[in-house]
């Protein structure tokens, strides 16, 4: 099936090896291949796993854990292997390879990541178009001798000038004889000979295979260095087949030039090569190390710079254009296909600038020394395709790619396209791919952000009601969703004037307002290609601005509501405190008034107050003031409840009138008490005192003349008011006429009651005039009200005062009435 291997793809001995897997060893392809094969086999043959042939679950778990551990450590092992390989390659290259006394690997000046293309740099150095990696000196002196220069160049301690260490001793090079010179020329000609097309295909294939290794460099002891071609005895069947297939039509595609090792010669003009190179050392202005004077020169300002500093200079990372300019050095395909997109928000990669004069398109030139040592190419790569030209085969070793070193400094700058100029882009040819990857990544992030913001806005719009099925992103869609909310949903944010203002803001750049509904529904989802990115960016910016303003308005509204709520709570608290203070002040003022006027002002002839007792008072609070309802219930004497201060009769009256139960007293009190409004109770005016005086003395008269009428037929439930006498003036007039034995009986029921009434209404004659004046003040005309008010001030008691039952004793020694 899909996971099982077909018959053609299986190894020839798979069934036999699988059947004898328990007795034989592991597969030669490794544990991973064996585990994958067994897993796929067990997955495709469940019957074997049921029978126990396919393997156990413990082995599967162990294999899975081992595979997971390998996956986690694979990258670390790979990095470690690469690091060890780089160290070995560096040591080998510094020991066996050099170019004119310099090296092809860095010398550790910079410890960062080497992200330049090492193959390109190696080729440029072997071609003498870029300076090799010279060994830098921390210190240099013009007075150093040859062996001191040699020690400094080799990294050894600098000896004294007059002392030559044994490892630095050298002998003068022997003179080259004619025979040796001819053999050397023959070897050089063999290395520079171009293969002839008339030779066999296998010979050309062997020569190309042996002399053009892809990544490994030849050593001096290799057959390539000795000049002998590989023997046909060492040819394998694979090489023969490859030569037949690749060289069938007589064309050879050799991508890499052929490297050769020049004869080893440690002397230049009779001097050691180190002494020759470092006798005129120059300082690099960037790393401040001393190098041989054969350094790179900037193309613009002709400043020296070493190769290690040069390979560290690169383009900045891709970034948005700072001044709205598109990348002038963008790839041609990108510039032609996405010209409209590049001008909007495409990332750009500006070329590196010169560290000295800040000229863009930084590049260097190199003038090699006048001698050749170490590695070189067999022929010029530009002349290799021309096989008919005999010049390349006869070119001498010393004359190839040698440029004359002029002592005069270059006066003019070179162009970045000059063939001798090496720019930073040539050292890092993958900058275009990195730029394309960065642009693709930025486009994906922008699309994801746009989708997220759009989805969030649509979700908010759907939750608020309205036309939730129009998934348009344009300004008109925003306007439509903002204005299309349900007017009945008061909690919706789209109905607020703030969001309407935002919707108007988003529509500020629209051209027309009448658009077809279908076109409006589609929005700006599929506009032309040249404006799609700009529209998406504008919509995203406006939606983000709308959301920010909406959040700001919402927070401001919430803050305002919170402040209003706190203000209301504070006002309510202050009002409550004011009411409480007013109530306390009123109560304190009333009690102080009561304290000053607590003694009942009665005529002096009536006697003194012997005792007082508090009565039950019903208190009722009203919004305008505080009124009190008098409920005076005495179990011994049935006294009228309408009076605030009553004068009790002698003790003989208690024997005449039996005590009344509390229900009869309460009913009698409710039927007899006049109803007063709260407004009247809360006004502390002189009219209130007048009414209090009237009520006091009317109750006094009632207690003297008509208390016995309150109980009819023994039940005491009379619905008729007790104030049914003619008038206070008439009653007082009748009392004056009868003098001391006067009687005023209404609704007389029996003789004992009449006698009791007569006994209760007996007052001293000398006080009748005073009481008469008070009672006449209550019934006087309005013209004489002021005089009556002044005269009766001594007998007024405020209505809110607690009613008290007092005993009045006669000066003549009448028996006291107990309350």
UniProtKB/Swiss-Prot annotation:
The keyword Disulfide bond does not apply. Keywords: Cytoplasm. The gene is sip5. This is Protein sip5. May negatively regulate the snf1 kinase. Residues 198-211, 327-344, 691-720 have a biased composition (Low complexity). It comes from Aspergillus oryzae (strain ATCC 42149 / RIB 40) (Yellow koji mold). The keyword Acyltransferase does not apply. Residues 29-39, 57-78, 168-185, 317-326, 556-585, 734-746 have a biased composition (Basic and acidic residues). Residues 1-78, 157-265, 317-345, 478-497, 513-534, 556-779, 792-819 are annotated as: Disordered. One of its GO terms (cellular component) is cytoplasm. Belongs to the SIP5 family. CDD domains: SIP5-like. InterPro entries: Sip5/DA2. It is found in: Cytoplasm. Residues 212-233, 487-497, 641-651, 662-679, 747-760, 808-819 have a biased composition (Polar residues). It comes from the Eukaryota. PANTHER family: PROTEIN SIP5.
């Amino acid at each position: 099936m899909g996971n099982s291997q077909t018959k053609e793809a299986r190894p020839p001995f798979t069934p036999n090896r699988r059947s004898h897997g328990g007795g034989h060893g592991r597969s030669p392809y490794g544990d991973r291949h064996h585990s994958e094969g067994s897993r796929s086999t067990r997955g495709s043959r469940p019957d074997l796993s049921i029978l126990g042939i396919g393997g156990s679950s413990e082995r599967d778990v162990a294999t899975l854990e081992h595979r997971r551990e390998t996956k986690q450590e694979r990258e670390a092992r790979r990095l470690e292997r690469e690091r060890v390989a780089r160290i070995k390659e560096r040591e080998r290259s510094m020991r066996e390879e050099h170019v004119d006394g310099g090296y092809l690997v860095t010398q550790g000046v910079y410890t960062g990541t080497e992200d330049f293309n090492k193959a390109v740099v190696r080729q440029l150095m072997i071609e003498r178009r870029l300076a090799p990696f010279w060994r830098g000196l921390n210190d240099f002196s013009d007075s150093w001798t040859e062996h001191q220069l040699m020690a400094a160049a080799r990294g050894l301690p600098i000896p004294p000038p007059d002392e030559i260490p044994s490892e630095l001793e050298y002998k003068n090079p022997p003179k080259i004889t004619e025979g040796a010179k001819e053999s050397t020329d023959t070897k050089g000609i063999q290395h520079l000979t171009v293969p002839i097309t008339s030779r066999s295909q296998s010979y050309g294939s062997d020569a190309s295979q042996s002399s053009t290794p892809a990544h490994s460099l030849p050593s001096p002891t290799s057959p390539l260095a000795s000049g002998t071609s590989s023997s046909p005895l060492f040819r394998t069947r694979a090489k023969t087949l490859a030569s037949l297939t690749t060289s069938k039509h007589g064309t050879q595609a050799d991508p890499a030039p052929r490297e050769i090792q020049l004869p080893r010669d440690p002397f230049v003009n009779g001097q050691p090569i180190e002494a020759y190179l470092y006798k005129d050392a120059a300082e690099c202005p960037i790393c401040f190390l001393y190098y041989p004077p054969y350094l790179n020169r900037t193309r613009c300002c002709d400043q020296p710079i070493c190769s290690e500093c040069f390979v560290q200079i690169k383009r900045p990372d891709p970034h948005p254009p700072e001044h709205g300019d598109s990348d002038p050095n963008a790839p041609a395909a990108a510039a032609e296909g996405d010209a409209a997109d590049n001008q909007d928000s495409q990332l750009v990669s500006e070329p590196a600038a010169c560290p000295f004069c800040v000229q863009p398109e930084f590049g260097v030139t190199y003038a090699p020394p006048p001698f050749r040592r170490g590695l070189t190419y067999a022929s010029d790569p530009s002349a290799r395709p021309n096989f008919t030209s005999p010049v390349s085969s006869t070119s001498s070793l010393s004359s190839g790619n040698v440029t004359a070193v002029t002592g005069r400094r270059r006066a003019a700058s070179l162009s970045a396209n000059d063939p001798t100029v090496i720019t930073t882009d040539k050292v890092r040819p993958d900058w275009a791919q990195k730029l394309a990857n960065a642009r693709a990544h930025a486009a994906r992030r922008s699309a994801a952000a746009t989708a997220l913001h759009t989805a969030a806005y649509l979700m908010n719009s759907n939750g608020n009601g309205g036309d939730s099925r129009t998934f348009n992103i344009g300004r008109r869609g925003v306007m439509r969703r903002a204005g299309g909310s349900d007017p009945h949903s008061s909690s919706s944010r789209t109905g607020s004037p703030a969001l309407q203002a935002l919707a108007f803001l988003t529509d500020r750049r629209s051209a027309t307002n009448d658009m077809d509904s279908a076109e409006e529904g589609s929005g700006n989802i599929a506009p032309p290609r040249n404006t799609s990115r700009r529209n998406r960016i504008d919509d995203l910016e406006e939606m983000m601005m709308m959301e920010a303003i909406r959040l700001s308005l919402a927070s401001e509204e919430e803050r305002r509501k919170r402040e209003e709520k706190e203000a209301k709570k504070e006002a309510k608290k202050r009002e409550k405190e004011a009411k409480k203070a007013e109530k306390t002040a009123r109560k304190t003022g009333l009690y102080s008034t009561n304290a000053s006027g607590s003694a009942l002002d009665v005529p002096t002839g009536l006697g003194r107050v012997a005792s007082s007792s508090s009565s039950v008072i019903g208190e009722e609070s009203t919004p305008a003031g505080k009124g009190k309802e008098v409920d005076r219930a005495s179990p011994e004497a049935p006294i009228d409840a309408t009076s605030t201060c009553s004068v009790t009769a002698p003790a003989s009256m208690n024997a005449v009138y039996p005590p009344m139960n509390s229900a009869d007293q309460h009913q009698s009190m409710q039927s007899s008490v006049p109803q007063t409004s709260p407004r009247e109770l809360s006004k502390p005016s002189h009219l209130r005192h007048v009414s209090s005086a009237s009520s006091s003395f009317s109750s006094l008269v009632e207690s003297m003349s008509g208390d016995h009428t309150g109980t009819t037929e023994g039940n005491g439930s009379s619905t008729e008011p007790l104030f049914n006498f003619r008038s206070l003036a008439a009653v007082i007039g009748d009392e004056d006429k009868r003098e001391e034995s006067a009687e005023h009986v209404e609704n007389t029921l029996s003789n004992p009651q009449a006698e009791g009434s007569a006994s209760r209404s007996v007052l001293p004659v000398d006080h009748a005039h005073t009481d008469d004046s008070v009672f006449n003040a209550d019934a006087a005309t309005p013209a004489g009200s002021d005089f009556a008010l002044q005269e009766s001030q001594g007998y007024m008691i405020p209505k809110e005062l607690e009613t008290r039952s007092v005993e009045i004793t006669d000066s003549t020694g009448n028996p006291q009435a107990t309350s």
